[in-house]
Structure formats: C-alpha cells, structure tokens
Amino acid sequence: TWDEAYDVITEKLIDIRNKYGADSIGGISSSRATNEENYLMQKMIRVAVGTNNIDGCARVCHAPTAWGMQQSFGTGAATNSVEDLKQADAIFLFGANPIKGHPVTGAKIKQAFMKGVTSIVVDPVKTKLADLATYHLQIRPGTNVAILNMMAHYIVTDNLVNEYFIESYTEKYNEFKNHVEGLNMDELEKLTGVSKELVKKAAHAYATAERAMEFHGLGVTEHFQGSKTVMLLSNLAMMTGNIGRNGVGLNPLRGQNNVQGAADMGVQPHQGAGYLDINKPE
C-alpha cells in the first residue's frame, strides 16, 4: 500500500541520515512540477532531512542567467510578464527560437513582429522569427559578447544613453563607458561577421524605443560566455532605461515549463525560496 511505501521511504532516509549524516542525502526536483510541489520538496530536504542538497535543472540550464542577473539586478528572475509584449515598442530576441521551444510565448512574439513592432534578432541561424525581424544580426557562433559590445559602443558614442536612469539607479557606469568607447568596430565587425552599420541601426532601434523588451534563451546560457552575455544584456537595458517598467526588461526563456517557478521556490543548493542566500543567517 501507499502507507507502507511511505513508511519504507521514511525509515530508509532516517537510517541513512543517522549512519552517514544529513549531507549524504540529496534531492532532485523537477522544473515540470508545480510551484507547490517544488516548494514542498526543497522544504522536506532542508527541514526534515537537514541538508541544502536540493537541486534541479533550474540551476543547471540557466545558471548563467541567474548569476548574471543577480549581479546586475539583485535577482535572477525574469523582470516582466509575457503579457507586457502588448506594451513593447521594440523586441530584442537573443539566442532563442521560441516558436519551436516556447510556442505560446513564441506565438505572441510572432504576432508582435507581424504587427510591425521594431524587432531585433541575434542568432547564427535564420529562424522564422529572424526572417520576420526588422534587423537580423546573424553572428558567427561564439561572438555573443562581441556583438553586444558593438551595440553598447554605438549607444554610448551616439549619445543614446538614458542619463537620468544611470545617475539614479546604477553604479560604475563610467568604467563600462570607457571600455566600450575604446573598442575597434572594424575588428569586431570581422569577428562577428555582421556589418557594423547594421549593428548600429539595431542599437539605435533598441535605445530609442519608448519600451524595448528583451528575451534570451539557451543560445545564450548554455555557452561558455553565458554569464558575461547576460550581464551585457543587463547593461544595455540599464543604460537605455529599459528596466523597471511595463513592456521592457530582461526575460529569459527557460528550458522547461516551470524553471522559473522551481528557482523561485528554492530548488537550488545555494538559495532558498525567494532567492534567500543560505549563507546569510537573516
């Protein structure tokens, strides 16, 4: 019976914990489970068993997003709702093919593209959305950081920066500004394989939009430049004031349907529910 099965599981866990310690046990939860199930799983492992050995694909597949956004914004969660697409004047899609991987969100993005919203796609592959995009930056694989540095360069040198937002809400901007100002666009053009004039147009479109909304996927995060790319995407949003409002922000497209929820609920060894740092007693 189920009652007998639960008794066996409980007895075995207690026996292992008593013999080898709580850290000899680990739990793996699922990003296809509900928020409630994920919360209970991490709570059981942390409270009943007494260890932080709880994990899932939320940390593995989108660790660069979580870490990069944590460094930039203090949280690794998406900043906006998919419904905010209705308010966006520009959409920036980087390293993702949501028509295939996230069909509901992909359909909403496609509808926005077809309605004429200014659209920028960065992808080595010519996807259906890339065909529809206003600007397709078809980079060489491995040049994610380079293409974003080019965009940042043009936003800075062409005076498209949101000075009020930077002065009010950011730190160390001048260091970043000095770095991107000194970049050689001819060299980066050769590296990325994308015309610097096309990059300049895309940068202007993103920076001058009233509300520009960014989405990125596993083409960014499952990559050796993942965290740096996410931090540069964050920098672009901050330097143009495209954060903290409806219709803007950074919005990772995760690998499974509830990766965001699993992370929110604390299914990761280094953070509890609500992204609480386990190393901080408060």
Describe each model-derived feature in a short phrase.
Residues 1-282:
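Catalytic alpha/large subunits of respiratory electron-transfer oxidoreductases
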